[in-house]
Amino acid sequence: MKVLMVEPGKVPYAAEIGEGLEPLQAAVGGDIQAVYPYDDPVALICNEEGKYMGLPLNRALRDDEGNIYDIVAGNFFLCGLGEEDFTDLPADLMEKYRQQFEHPEQFVRIAGKILAVKQPVPSPEGRISGDRALFLQGGAAGRNAAGRVHGPGL
């Protein structure tokens, strides 16, 4: 079955998972839980005990207004829905959810509210891309000889 695999700290990728319960459990590292947070015919399959096991927090689930209502812990994948079983994730939905989950997230609690901070996406060459790339890699924006942070807008 073709799925979109989403691992903590990594960009999502297309994967092939075998049929039956055991391959599904292996993909998420334990008992599975299927949730249906979207109007599209997709299931999000995660580890049912991921939070209790202390698995790394992965991605936030948001409501229609963009507010976080849950955070998935550990690996999860998205697959299609058949009449009575899970199926291949169609190519258009694969791309839609790849874009939605493209950036790994870190989570912080500020004033009692949990915020998701999108992380830069490594390029295929292993370089960080995005506006903060130069700063994070110590390029033109970084620390000067005295150890002070400098660069555009800093």
PLM segments and residue spans:
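Short, extreme N-terminal segment that most often corresponds to the first beta-strand
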Residues: 1-14, 18, 152
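Contiguous interface-forming segments/domains that mediate binding rather than catalysis
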Residues: 18-25, 42
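Short, structured protein-protein interaction patches enriched in aromatics and acidic/basic residues
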Residues: 40-63
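Extended coiled-coil/helical scaffolds and adjacent low-complexity linkers that mediate multimerization
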Residues: 87-123
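Non-Sec secretion/translocation targeting segments of pathogen effectors
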Residues: 124-128, 136, 140-154
